[in-house]
């Protein structure tokens, strides 16, 4: 996993230096996955950290779906979502992994690869490096429930939601209280959320990975 905090945070700025995102609804805020004319995800900004993973929007039994595949690459997609996480604290999503990076283990820098990662990003200005990221991951090796600080920067914290191949090939519905998780991980009140990210990487292990993500939304 390759995450460069300053580069990520700077990329979140609009041309006028302001944060932008969808209007929050009273009880629910969807993070739309819409197929663009070229097959990519409309409104999602790609960032290729190492090589170029394949990503596209397809229709599955879970609805409009992000399909990601990696062969020794590392790629993230970002979607603006500016809101107070305390108002809509619950992140909901569906995901499916069909191939995990061989030997991936978030606890070690040399094997820090996952088939699928879902992040909520909290910008902190004026110093971009201060931005906080809460990541929910499907790891190959680390046990479910593991809380891990990134081996590259302390401002990125992970919670292992799924691990190993037991549920490979199955759609799984997830739900996390991001507000509570942020407070637990960083021991502080969260600032305004800025973006959501979906990522796949298998560059450190030089292996392959494949995953699917659908129906992302925040709720009370």
Describe the residue ranges of each PLM region.
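Bacterial N-terminal signal peptides
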Residues: 3-15
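Extracellular carbohydrate-recognition regions
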Residues: 19-49
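Extracellular beta-strand elements of beta-rich domains used
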Residues: 36, 196, 214-218
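Short carbohydrate-recognition loop motifs
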Residues: 56-76
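Extracellular/lumenal carbohydrate-interaction signature centered on repeated Trp-anchored short motifs
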Residues: 80-91, 165-168
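Solvent-exposed strand-to-loop "edge" motifs in beta-rich extracellular domains
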Residues: 94-100, 123-125, 179
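Extracellular/luminal beta-rich ligand-recognition
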Residues: 111-156
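Extracellular beta-strand ligand-recognition surfaces/modules
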Residues: 113-118, 154-164, 168-207
């Amino acid at each position: 996993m390759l995450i460069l905090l300053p580069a990520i945070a700077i990329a979140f700025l609009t041309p006028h230096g302001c944060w932008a995102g969808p209007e929050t609804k009273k009880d629910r805020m969807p993070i739309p996955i819409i197929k663009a004319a070229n097959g990519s995800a409309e409104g999602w900004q790609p960032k290729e950290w190492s090589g170029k993973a394949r990503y596209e929007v397809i229709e599955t039994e879970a609805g409009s779906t992000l399909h990601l595949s990696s062969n020794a690459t590392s790629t993230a997609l970002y979607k603006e979502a500016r809101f107070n996480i305390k108002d809509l604290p619950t992140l909901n999503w569906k995901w499916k992994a069909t191939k995990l990076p061989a030997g991936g283990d978030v606890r070690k820098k040399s094997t820090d690869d996952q088939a699928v990662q879902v992040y909520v990003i909290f910008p902190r200005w004026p110093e971009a490096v201060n931005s906080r990221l809460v990541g929910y991951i499907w790891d190959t090796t680390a046990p479910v429930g593991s809380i891990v600080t990134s081996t590259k920067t302390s401002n990125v914290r992970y919670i292992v939601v799924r691990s190993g191949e037991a549920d490979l090939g199955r759609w799984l519905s997830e739900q996390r209280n991001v507000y509570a998780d942020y407070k637990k991980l960083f021991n502080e009140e969260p600032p305004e959320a800025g973006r959501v990210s979906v990522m796949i990487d298998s560059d450190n292990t030089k292996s392959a990975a494949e995953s699917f993500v659908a129906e992302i939304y925040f709720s009370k």
